[in-house]
Amino acid sequence: MCRKVLVGIATVAAVGLGAVAAAPGQAAPPRYSAKVTNPYFPLLPGMRWEYRGVKDGRPLRDVVEVTHRIERIGGVPCAVVLDRNYVDGRLAESTIDWYAQDGRGTVWYFGEATKELDRRGRVTSTEGSWRAGTDGARQGVFMPAHPRVGQSFAQEHYPGHAEDRFAVVSRRATVRVPFGAFRGRALRTEEWTPLEPGVRDAKWYVEGIGEVKEATLKGGDERAELVSFRRR
């Protein structure tokens, strides 16, 4: 793993679960809010995104909605986001994600409860589920307050189950999706996990909207592009 990645991961690891204890050198733990206003990843109640694409050669539809609920994870108030993944027209995966924002504007990922479903709607797997403060899992950085090219972070800290990482590769990327074209306005990141060393994905974010596109770069065949967005 490159030095930049190690630095980013070490920084996140040092923070730990802010609701429980302060990091070394900090006067107090970070203050978190369920009101997520980071311009590249806003999560306000009522927001809704719909994506269309392909997964392993099959039609994909992904619907993401910010609920009006707030849940406390390790004492931290978190926004609750519902993510439903449809493949070939049927619900294949349903996930609840928890996010909170610190006072500087960085968005933290506090976990997820995911369910994979068979054609009859029965749960076949919950692998990848985790919650900060439970079984040694800790929150990670999902979107920094001021992303800079070269920054790397760990989004998840649940060894053996959830270990996503990402790096900022461009702040002026161009991206075109059914919802619109954004010339030189997109933040581009690349994601990977040591649990799947042969897989690498790219994501594009636009200020005021959030994620507009995701595509597998290697190790798979998945693409999702924003087709509609409701602010609230």
Where are the regions that the model predicts?
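Secretory targeting and sorting signals
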Residues: 2-25
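Conserved functional acidic sites
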Residues: 26-232
